Swiss-Prot record:
Organism: Hordeum vulgare (Barley)
Protein name according to UniProt: 23 kDa jasmonate-induced protein
Domain of life: Eukaryota
Family: Belongs to the jasmonate-induced protein family.
Induction statement: By jasmonate.
Disulfides per UniProt: none
Length: 210
């Protein structure tokens, strides 16, 4: 299993084996079962331990424990990232998060600077019943002074940063964000939340609900 990814992928075959869904199995069926299994097999606990251990190795300072869950019924492929303040620590962004898996990473503030952690990551998936793809944005800010915030949205493939510029996301969206964010597009739903303090979880759940 790739670094920073937790849980056994949930496929159509997984769903058929449960006997809970009528065939033919659809993407929504696979996504629905993944949502039901969000904490199955200790994968959520293992993802949390992973970021907790990264933070322990990192030491003192502002650090954001990022946890992303895929319940889209499709694979999320890493597309791009942006750092406004700080950087990812020790392990890369997960390259692929399959349906039913958690992805995890730690983002930390710039060393020796009076600045917090602020970043964004974009994952790409197929649009349901289409050959086209869409981009999922998950972004967070933990300023040196001020409140924490998250912002998420779903847009067309290649939206970032040519249409949704990083300056716009940071100065208009993140700076006016709260501790929760939700967006829907293409039938998908993206939900994000962040804790308080200088070391906390920032969580994103990407869904394809009925």
């Amino acid at each position: 299993m790739a670094s920073g990814v937790f849980g056994t992928p949930i496929s159509a075959q997984t769903v058929i084996a449960t006997g809970e869904y009528k065939e033919p199995i659809t993407q929504k069926d696979v996504a629905d079962y993944a949502m039901k299994m969000i904490n199955a097999g200790g994968k959520d606990v293992n993802a949390q331990k992973f970021v907790d251990n990264l933070k322990e190795r990192y030491g003192n300072g502002i650090a954001v424990k990022c946890l992303l869950y895929n319940a889209t019924g499709a694979t999320l492929n890493f597309a791009k990232y942006n750092d406004w303040h700080g950087h990812i620590y020790d392990t890369p962004y997960p390259s692929d998060i399959q349906n039913g898996q958690w992805g995890a990473f730690l983002h930390v503030h710039p060393s020796g600077a009076a600045a917090g952690s602020a970043g964004a990551v974009v994952y790409r998936s197929k649009i349901p019943s289409s050959s086209s793809s869409c981009d999922w944005l998950f972004s967070w800010t933990v300023p040196y002074i001020g409140g924490n915030g998250v912002y998420t949205e779903i847009r067309e493939e290649g939206h970032y940063p040519s249409v949704g510029s990083w300056d716009y996301i940071y100065n208009v969206k993140l700076k006016n964000s709260s501790v929760t964010s939700i967006d829907s597009n293409y039938g998908y739903v993206s939900k994000a939340d962040i804790g308080e303090g200088t070391t906390m979880n920032a969580r994103g759940v990407f869904e394809f609900p009925y």
